[in-house]
């Protein structure tokens, strides 16, 4: 968005591009996220390969009920992996000639309250300093941006949930053409997908469980039980090629702005992945921040920056 408005940016990441593009992440995009990607000019492949869903199903008490999103809200969601979104954004940056640096270390946001903030980092054993106007801290829960805010200013609120979230990827067609959220006495289950031939399935598990305790046979048996017989009858099982257990937490930090530093996404707030909200909230943050910075640079209007993160904003 900033590049389209003629605003130069530099992207720093402590991981390699190969590592970033190989991570398994979120896959359900809300309407506002799709609109933001359209505005950024990176939605061509999304529209070609994404899977539009008009609703989803809830399964509980031995029955399942479809919720008609399009009918009730006039909006749909799109299944398109975060990994693919990232690839599209990287390709757009390359096309636009925007700078980005991977495998950086010892990143330090500095002089945040001054008119000339900077970011120090080390790459290939050499130290660099980037002078800038503003810093967007989009570096996730474990990044350095949030902790650059002084301890006497930063407030955090969090809750760790007493269960884990076991997810697998399998190259089998999805059990249902839309997502299925299943409530069962054994725990929650979610049937999602990444494509018409690749499925992403989850079950709630004990917080102390390990992946080795969940061989595929055990997963499929438990997943089928929680889905219920009607849906499970359509389930195609097979060998998973990706399996992990994630702890579930909720987390909020404030303020999201300190001087010339703005936090966005998981750096500022985390919600459990069960609702597919994390990526969508992050892009909503960036959409608001981009609008504010574009107004600053193209119109000399700082009203949006002054109000950013301090008052309710529409998230369409």
Go through the PLM ranges and name each one:
Residues 247-262:
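FAD-binding beta-loop-beta segment adjacent to the flavin cofactor pocket
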Residues 22-25, 30-92, 96:
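Active-site-adjacent segment of FAD-dependent monooxygenases/related oxidoreductases
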Residues 3-24:
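Glycine-rich FAD pyrophosphate-binding loop
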Residues 309-316:
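Conserved small/polar residues in nucleotide/adenosyl-binding loops
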Residues 277-283:
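A conserved FAD-binding loop/helix module that cradles the flavin
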Residues 259-272:
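Short FAD-binding loop at a beta-strand-to-alpha-helix junction that anchors the flavin cofactor
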Residues 91, 95-248:
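Conserved FAD-binding catalytic core of PHBH/FMO-like flavoproteins
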Residues 283-302:
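Internal hydrophobic alpha-helix adjacent to the cofactor/substrate pocket in enzyme cavities
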């Amino acid at each position: 968005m900033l590049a389209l408005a003629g605003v130069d940016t530099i992207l720093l990441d402590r991981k390699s591009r190969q590592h970033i593009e190989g991570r398994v992440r979120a896959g359900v995009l809300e309407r506002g996220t799709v609109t933001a990607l359209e505005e950024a000019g990176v939605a061509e492949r999304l529209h070609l390969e994404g899977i539009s869903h008009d609703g989803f199903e809830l399964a509980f008490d031995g029955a399942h009920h479809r919720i008609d999103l399009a009918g009730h809200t006039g909006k749909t969601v799109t299944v398109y992996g975060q990994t693919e979104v990232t690839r599209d954004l990287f390709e757009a940056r390359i096309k636009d000639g925007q700078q980005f640096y991977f495998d950086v270390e010892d990143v330090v946001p500095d002089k945040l309250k001054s008119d000339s903030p900077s970011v120090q980092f080390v790459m290939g054993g050499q130290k660099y300093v980037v002078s800038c106007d503003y810093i967007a801290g989009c570096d996730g829960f474990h990044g350095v941006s949030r902790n650059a805010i002084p301890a006497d200013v930063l407030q955090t609120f969090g809750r760790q949930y007493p269960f884990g979230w076991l997810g697998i990827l399998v190259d089998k067609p999805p059990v249902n053409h839309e997502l299925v959220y299943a409530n069962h006495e054994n725990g929650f289950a979610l049937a999602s997908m990444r494509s018409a031939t690749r499925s992403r399935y989850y079950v709630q598990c004990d917080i102390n469980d390990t992946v080795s305790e969940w061989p595929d046979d055990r997963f499929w048996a438990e997943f089928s039980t929680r889905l219920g017989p009607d849906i499970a009858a359509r389930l195609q099982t097979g060998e998973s090629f990706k399996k992990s257990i994630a702890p579930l937490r909720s987390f909020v930090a404030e303020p999201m702005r300190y001087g010339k530093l703005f936090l966005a996404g998981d750096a500022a707030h985390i919600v459990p992945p069960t609702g597919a909200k994390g990526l969508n909230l992050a892009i909503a943050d960036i959409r608001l921040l981009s609008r504010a910075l574009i107004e600053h640079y193209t119109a000399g209007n700082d009203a949006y920056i002054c109000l950013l993160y301090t008052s309710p904003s529409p998230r369409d």
